[in-house]
């Protein structure tokens, strides 16, 4: 098999045996990019020169007999809303087309420290607002399983890169499903860790109480290794949880006997595609055969998650995005009459339609006459949704649902129907409102398109999710499936 198709732990074994070099892996990934990038379009910026320098440094360590970490020399792609010092960071927006950060995000620094090789910055929905990567200010990204379909979003470039062999691992961000939904649509593993477990320092903010950085990987073992690298307290992030470091590989036991898993009936309702439902039921059957006790449960406030999310997230976005004014960095329209006109023109030309729509929604819900009726009420609903999860986890080790109600849809199919697009995240949004961890892993193909299964867990209990996901993966073939491009 080609090097670009292997997992990080398989490549690590070959590296430590000196059967391949880190530079071999990097070259294999860039050769793959040359083959398929014109079709998939995962990237906004490639960093080949820096990548080759880093790969050679890893090879020098190996030659000197130094021990290397499990992810040393492994190519990783970074979503373009994480600051990378000296490397353009655009958030896929025209308003940041020329922004080069003077510092790197903590997660990026941790990746560098682990001797991973950054391949480039991936495409996304502008400012992480969207579910298809069609809202990018630069170009569309295509699903490697069917180039006429979307990869999901907002981290569509990161998911597509891993699925297409253009990176071994990638980082994305998840505000309402932006890691898990594209992971499901592209047939890879994606995780949104607990809010506060991974530093947000250097992540360009969309909705600060919901945003969370997380990985895309080929399998669950790689996921555990990446979490070992990126999780942990960061004094630069005031919302970072001060927890002791966990070795997540200890949870890869292939044993779920006696575990209790709940399936909320609200997540299996009418909007779920029948083929998706069929694959989820097959996975439930497999988990039962492996010794888990799986039963239906109820999360009564689920229906209110979507409206609450689109009030809270847009309110926070309207505040966060006020900083893009043409004065300090990014796009500045020169032919303005005065300062106010420059603000208006820079923002109206720099932001895309979806970003403008969400800024207007958020500004409206925060305005004096509507604050109590909308924003405050949404915060109360958020509390009710969190209480639903708290009650469920008194009884269950984890909850299970589809990740996305459908498989990947055609490019352009939902562009003119924002409500239909928003409903793509109906199964993922409640997790962000509650701040808990969730993982999406492949559970089969429907019409040769991947279907994703979501596991949701207690806050800071990523280990249980990895344990269940690893057991399911070890007893099925789904994470070993690769698209033909």
Swiss-Prot record:
It comes from the Bacteria. This is Glutamyl-tRNA(Gln) amidotransferase subunit A. It holds the Pfam family Amidase. It catalyses: L-glutamyl-tRNA(Gln) + L-glutamine + ATP + H2O = L-glutaminyl-tRNA(Gln) + L-glutamate + ADP + phosphate + H(+). Gene3D superfamilies: Amidase signature (AS) domain. Allows the formation of correctly charged Gln-tRNA(Gln) through the transamidation of misacylated Glu-tRNA(Gln) in organisms which lack glutaminyl-tRNA synthetase. The reaction takes place in the presence of glutamine and ATP through an activated gamma-phospho-Glu-tRNA(Gln). Its EC number is 6.3.5.7. The lineage of its organism: Bacteria, Bacillati, Bacillota, Clostridia, Eubacteriales. The active site is at residues 79, 154, 178. InterPro entries: Amidase, Amidase_CS, Amidase_dom, AS_sf, GatA. Heterotrimer of A, B and C subunits. GO terms for molecular function: ATP binding; glutaminyl-tRNA synthase (glutamine-hydrolyzing) activity. One of its GO terms (cellular component) is glutamyl-tRNA(Gln) amidotransferase complex. Transmembrane segments: none annotated. Keywords: ATP-binding, Ligase, Nucleotide-binding, Protein biosynthesis.
């Amino acid at each position: 098999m080609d090097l670009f198709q292997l997992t990080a732990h398989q490549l690590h074994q070959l590296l430590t045996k000196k059967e391949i070099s880190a530079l071999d892996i990097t070259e294999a990934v860039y050769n793959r990019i040359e083959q398929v990038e014109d079709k998939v379009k995962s990237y906004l910026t490639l960093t080949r020169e820096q990548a080759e320098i880093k790969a050679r440094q890893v090879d020098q360590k190996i030659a000197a007999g130094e021990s290397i970490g499990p992810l040393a020399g492994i190519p990783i792609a970074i979503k373009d809303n994480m600051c990378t010092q000296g490397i353009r960071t655009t958030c896929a927006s025209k308003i940041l087309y020329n922004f080069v950060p003077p510092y790197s995000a903590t997660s990026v620094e941790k990746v560098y420290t682990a001797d991973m090789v950054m391949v480039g910055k991936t495409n996304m929905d502008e400012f992480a607002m969207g579910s298809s990567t069609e809202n990018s200010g630069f170009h569309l990204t295509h699903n490697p399983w069917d180039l006429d379909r979307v990869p999901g979003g907002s981290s569509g470039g990161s998911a597509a890169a891993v699925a297409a062999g253009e990176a071994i691992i990638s980082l994305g961000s998840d505000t309402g499903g932006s890691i898990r939904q594209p992971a499901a649509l592209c047939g890879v593993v994606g995780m949104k860790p607990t809010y506060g477990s991974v530093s947000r320092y250097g992540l360009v903010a969309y909705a600060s109480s919901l945003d969370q950085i997380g990985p895309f990987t080929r399998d669950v073992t790689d996921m555990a290794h990446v979490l070992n690298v990126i999780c942990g307290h960061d004094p630069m992030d005031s919302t970072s949880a001060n927890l002791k470091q966990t070795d997540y590989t200890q949870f890869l036991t292939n044993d779920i006997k006696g575990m209790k898993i709940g399936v909320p009936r609200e997540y299996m309702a009418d909007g779920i595609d029948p083929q998706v439902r069929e694959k989820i039921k097959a996975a439930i059957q497999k988990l039962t055969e492996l010794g888990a006790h799986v039963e239906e449960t109820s999360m009564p406030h689920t229906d209110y998650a979507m409206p609450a999310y689109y009030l809270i997230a847009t309110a926070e976005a309207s505040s966060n995005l006020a900083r893009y004014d043409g004065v300090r960095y990014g796009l500045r329209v020169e032919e303005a009459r005065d300062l106010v006109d420059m603000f208006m023109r820079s923002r109206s030309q720099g932001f895309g339609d979806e970003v403008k729509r969400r800024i207007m929604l958020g500004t409206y819900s925060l305005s004096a006459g509507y604050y109590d009726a909308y924003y405050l009420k949404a915060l109360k609903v958020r509390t009710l949704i969190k209480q639903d999860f708290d009650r469920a986890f008194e009884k269950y080790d984890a909850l299970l649902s589809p990740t996305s109600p459908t498989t990947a849809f055609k490019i352009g199919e939902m562009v003119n129907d924002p409500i239909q697009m928003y409903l793509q995240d109906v199964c993922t949004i409640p997790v962000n409102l509650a701040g808990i961890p969730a993982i999406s892993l492949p559970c089969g193909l429907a019409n040769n398109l991947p279907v994703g299964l979501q596991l949701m867990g207690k806050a800071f209990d990523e280990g249980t999710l990895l344990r269940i996901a690893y057991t399911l993966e070890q007893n099925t073939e789904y994470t070993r499936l690769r698209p033909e491009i």
